[in-house]
Amino acid sequence: MCGGAVISDYIAPEKIARSSGKSSWRSNGVFDCSIYDFDGNFDELESDEPFVFSSTHKHHASGSASDGKKKQSSRYKGIRRRPWGRWAAEIRDPIKGVRVWLGTFNTAEEAARAYDLEAKRIRGAKAKLNFPNESSGKRKAKAKTVQQVEENHEADLDVAVVSSAPSSSCLDFLWEENNPDTLLIDTQWLEDIIMGDANKKHEPNDSEEANNVDASLLSEELLAFENQTEYFSQMPFTEGNCDSSTSLSSLFDGGNDMGLWS
């Protein structure tokens, strides 16, 4: 330093002054202060050259900036910043034993997400990610979306099945549309016949009663006819060389005209 010479010069006179002072004090009993030239010593310490602290200040500033960049680059795994400002992402593949280049990105977050995707592909669930919460949230949202899509698909299938089932009115409309000339037939008479047959089974049959009446009348007529034949068989003209049966047969046959009423 520039003041080193002054200090060295200042120390030597002090020792000399002490030794001389002691001797003068001892000899004369009075201390001589003339040997202490304080103003002169301070004048020698003053210097016109200013102290320069800018170099050390610049050194600390550059160090803090580099520390900030290092902290920012080390905040995420598998990324580093290029000198021109872009961010590079890469990951080590343990199977191949090489570092896989993932590309350069505009922001550190984009590079970190690219690293996360490749890490999940290589290491699976054991991968250490930069955004673990974000990936789990995405998986939950994806699972929920898939479940919602499946439920909507099942609902659409149910609606399609219900809507595809044709109703009777639709069938009638289609039949009428395809067959415009078809006449509408009233089937009420068929229902009346069916209902009438069912009622007749429970009611008494008039035809059977009529048949019974006819049979009784026929039996009465036959009985009367037999009585008449017996009457004719007892008449005197039937007596002769022919028996009664022959005379009766000849009477009905009309072969021999007999003047019964003459």
Swiss-Prot record:
| Region Disordered, annotated ranges | 56-79
Q: Which residues bind DNA?
A: 75-132
Q: Which residues form a coiled coil?
A: none
Please report what switches on or represses expression of this protein. Induced under hypoxic conditions in roots. Induced during hypoxia under nitrate nutrition. Induced by ethylene. Induced by hydrogen peroxide.
* UniProt keyword list: Activator, DNA-binding, Ethylene signaling pathway, Nucleus, Oxidation, Stress response, Transcription, Transcription regulation
Chain positions found as Cysteine sulfinic acid (-SO2H): 2
Query: In what way is this protein post-translationally modified?
Result: In presence of oxygen, the N-terminal cysteine residue (Cys-2) of ERF73 can be oxidized by cysteine oxidases, thus preparing the protein for N-end rule pathway-mediated proteasomal degradation. Under low oxygen levels, Cys oxidation is prevented, ERF73 is stabilized and confers tolerance to hypoxia.
Protein's cellular compartments: Nucleus
Transcription regulation among keywords: yes
Q: What one GO molecular function would you report for this record? A: sequence-specific DNA binding
| Main location as per UniProt | nucleus
- Outline what the protein does: Transcriptional activator involved in the hypoxic stress response. Acts as a transcriptional activator via the cis-acting element GCC box. Plays a role in low oxygen signaling and contributes to tolerance to anoxia stress by enhancing anaerobic gene expression and ethanolic fermentation. Invovlved in the modulation of ethylene responses under both normoxia and hypoxia.
Similarity comment: family membership: Belongs to the AP2/ERF transcription factor family. ERF subfamily.
Tell me the protein's name. Answer: Ethylene-responsive transcription factor ERF073
Organism classification, top ranks? Eukaryota, Viridiplantae, Streptophyta, Embryophyta, Tracheophyta
